[in-house]
Amino acid sequence: KKPDRYRNRPYLLWIAECKGVTVRDIELRNSAMWMQSYIRCERLRIDGIKVFNQSNKNNDLMDIDGCRDVIITRVIGDSDDDGITFKSTTDRISENITVSDCIISSHCNALKFGTETTAGFRNVTVTNCVIRESSVKEALTGNAEGICGIALEIVDGGIMENIAISNIVIDGPRVPFFVRLGN
């Protein structure tokens, strides 16, 4: 069930409680809300997609929420709001996730853990990615060069465990890393 604040705006892809999902070699453009929302999925593969989401506020590139056994690779994306975003809005942790070989541009946070973090994140590897300034110079949310490259935010009491981030190029955002831990 979507939270009330999101009910009147459709996502382009909203996939909930599915197993063995593959999204491959497609191009997605300008959703009314978050481009892709994956909730409580298992064995999710996202490979070789191109995403441009600059038409509205809250135009996240993708949101991975309470999913496990996820591989995200070769994604090229440019979003007005957050880029690749991990959440845990319920008691189910987001875990066993690999992100590699992606190019992400965002007016906000290109790679974000949080802020909706009820359960948290475990066993996440991010490697060989480039974070750069958006191609769109006028931001609806955030700012043209991006707010942050990588944001690690636990604010709802969840855990953040075994997160490995390596071989990342960050060129553009005002702040390369932001960490916020709270309850």
Describe the function of each predicted region.
Residues 1-183:
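Extracellular/periplasmic carbohydrate-active domains that bind, remodel
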